[in-house]
């Protein structure tokens, strides 16, 4: 393994990854700390959907977003652990998507447009696995 200096775009992509995953953490915290008043203000179909999310799906959400933040931080401090952490995060994403698309009525509630963000999250999660592996191959991560 070499100790090559990362290209500038490595830092840009890593910083974007951290911001993206931090937004996921904010969404997670907003969901799990939603007040009864905020929940009641939602349309009934959205409220019922949120209240029906099983604990394991919420845990998958937590693993996905916190794993993404940790993986991004590991990229920024140039550690090879980034790739395995992103893989765990990706598994959380997959579990969440399986629940949303196949075990709940989220598509009925949000419409086909509601599939866009989860698919973007899935694609970006896969990209971060690839990116962290390439960074390791390039000797940018130790």
Can you say where each PLM-predicted feature lies in the sequence?
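Topology signature of small-to-medium multi-pass alpha-helical membrane proteins
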Residues: 1-142
